[in-house]
Amino acid sequence: MTKAIGIDLGTTYSCVGVWQNDRVEIIANDQGNRTTPSYVAFTDTERLIGDSAKNQVAMNPHNTVFDAKRLIGRKFADAEVQSDIKHFPFTVFDKGGKPYIRVQYRGEDKEFSPEEISSMILTKMKEVAESYLGGTVTSAVVTVPAYFNDSQRQATKDAGTISGLNVLRIINEPTAAAIAYGLDKKTVGERNVLIFDLGGGTFDVSLLTIEEGIFEVKATAGDTHLGGEDFDNRLVNHFVQEFKRKHKKDLSSNPRALRRLRTACERAKRTLSSAAQTTIEIDSLFEGVDFYTSLTRARFEELCQDLFRSTLEPVEKVLRDAKIDKAAVHEIVLVGGSTRIPRIVKLVSDFFNGKEPNKSINPDEAVAYGAAVQAAILTGDTSEKTQDLLLLDVSPLSLGIETAGGVMTPLIKRNTTVPTKKSEIFSTYSDNQPGVLIQVYEGERARTKDNNLLGKFELAGIPPAPRGVPQIEVTFDIDANGILNVSASDKTTGKSNRITITNDKGRLSKEEIERMVNEAEKYKAEDEEATARITSRNALESYAYNLRNSLTDEKLADKFDAADKKKLEDAVNSTISWLDNSQEASKEEYEEHQKELEAVANPIMQKLYAGAGGAPGGAPGGFPGGAPGGFPGGAPAGEDGPSVEEVD
C-alpha cells in the first residue's frame, strides 16, 4: 500500500514528512536539505524547482518565481496582492480578475496561475518523498495558515490536484504543530495552546484550544511580512555600509554581489543561533575586492532588536482577542526556522514569565511532522501503534555531565529503558564559586572530549561557600519520545535551571565522533588561541553595548551628570568603532581596550549606582571553569577576578 505524506507548503520553504516505522521521518531532498525553497525558475533550456531555482535567482531574476503563496486564492485587485507585486522582480498581471505570472521559458512567453506554481513545488515535494520511499505517492495532507479563507484553501487543494496528489485534507499549520507535539493527547479538559510561528517570510501567532482531540482556533494575529528574510535584509544593509566604509565602493547596484552577500548573511544568521560569533568570507565580492568580516551574536541582535521586539505585539493581541490571560496558556509551541534564534526564544519565554516553550521538534519541520501524523491517521496507517509510541525503547548511549578535569560522569547508563529519571548530587570545585556550568554529553568514553556534547546551561547565584559544601542536584529525565530534560537545582536556595535535548537527526555517528576527536587534537592549540581572542572580544563588545544601553535607558538617562554622560558616550562610541575596524585584533589588545573603557566607566557608574545600593557585579564562576565573559549588564570581572561562562 502506498504511503500518504504530510506537506508544509511554506511561503519561502517547504518540507515533507512521512509516517514510517512507527515514527515520522522528515525527508531530505536531493541536496540533502530537509527543507526545500518554494522557488520555481524558468530558463532557456529547463525548469528548476527548489534549491537549484533559488541558487540562480541573481542571474535570472525576472523568470524566478517565489512567494506564490502570497497570491494563491486571491483576487488581482486585493490590496495585499497589489502591494506585494511592487516588490516582485517577476511580472504579475490581471487575467479574469486573478493574478497570473508571466515568465520567459525556452524562448517564449508563458503564463501561470499561482496554483500552477504551487503545484510545481508540491510535485517537487512529492518526488522527494517518492525517491526516499521507492514508490509512487498519491495522497497527502497539506497545511495552510489558520487565517486562510475558503478560496485560498480551495486553491491550495487545486494545486495538489494539479500535481497529481489526492489531498486528503487541508489542515491549519498551528494545528499541525500541536499534533506534532501530541498536545491533543496530553490531558483531559480544555488546554490553551499558543503557537508562535516565525518563518522565512511571515509571522503568525495562533491561540488554539484543544479538548478531546478537537482543535478550535480562538484567535490569530501576526505580520504577513516579517520573517527570517527581514533579518537577512538587516545584515545585508549592515554589510553594504561596512563595505562602503572599508573599500569606498557601493555594491548595492550589483544584483549578483548582493545575492552572494545575502546567501552569506543567511548562513551567518543560522550559525549565530548556536555560536557567539561567525565570520563571513566572500572572495571577489565586488570589483575584485575580497570581503572578509565577522559578526557577533550581540551585534546581530542589536541590528534586529526592533524586529524581534515587534513579535510580542501579535502575541498580546491574540490573548486579548481570545480573552485569555497569559497565565492561562498551558503550552507554547515554537514553529518556523527563525524561532531557533536564542533571543526570540528568550523574549517569548520572558513574556510568559519564564515558561519554557515546546521546541524539541525542529521548528522548521514541526508543521510537516504534524501533517505526516495526520496523513497516517487518515489512511489508517498507524499500525496499531498510536502516536504515544514515537518512542525510543532504550537509550542507546550513556548520558552524563562533565565534572572537574573533563571527566564524563554518566547518570543514565546505555541501554536503560525509557522513560526513565535519575538524579545525583554534585558540588562546587572552588571556594565561593557562584555558578556551575552543566554540560550534557552522550557516549561511552571516560573523558568528555571524546564524547558528544548535547547541550549546556549555567546555574548561577550560588551563595558563597567553601568548595564541596553547596549541594547541586542534577536530574536527567527521558520521556517516551526520547526527549531528554536535564535540570540542576541548588538545594540551599532552590534556584534551578534546565535544558531540553531531543533525540533525532543531528546526532553524530560513532565514526564521526572518532574522526572529529582526531582532528580536534590537531586544531586544539589554534582553537584555544582563537577562543581566547573571541571571548575577550565578546566581553568587550558586550560591555560596550551594555554601557550604551545604560546611557539610553529611560530610567537611568537623566541620572547621569552631563559631563560624565558625554565622556562615557565618547568612550563607548570610540570603543565600538574600534571594534568594527579590528575584527582580528589580539586577545591582549581587546583586554587593553576593556581596561581603558573600564577606567572611564567604573567611576561614572559607581557614582550613578551609589544611590541605588552598589553596582551589580558580574556573576563569576563556572563548573569545570567557565570561559571568561560577563553576564550582560554586570560589570566584568577584573584581571584576577573569577571568570564566567557567557550566558545570553
UniProtKB/Swiss-Prot annotation:
One GO cellular component term of this record is: cytoplasm
* Predominant cellular place of this UniProt entry's protein: cytoplasm
Q: Which residues form a coiled coil?
A: none
Keyword terms of this UniProt record: ATP-binding, Chaperone, Cytoplasm, Nucleotide-binding, Stress response
Q: Please name the CDD domains in this protein's record.
A: ASKHA_NBD_HSP70_HSPA1
Q: SUPFAM superfamilies of this UniProt entry?
A: Actin-like ATPase domain, Heat shock protein 70kD (HSP70), C-terminal subdomain, Heat shock protein 70kD (HSP70), peptide-binding domain
Please list the residue ranges that the record marks as compositionally biased, kind Gly residues.
611-636
Concerning Pfam families, the annotation shows: HSP70 (PF00012)
* Name used for this protein in its record: Heat shock protein HSS1
Task: Identify the species of origin.
Answer: Puccinia graminis
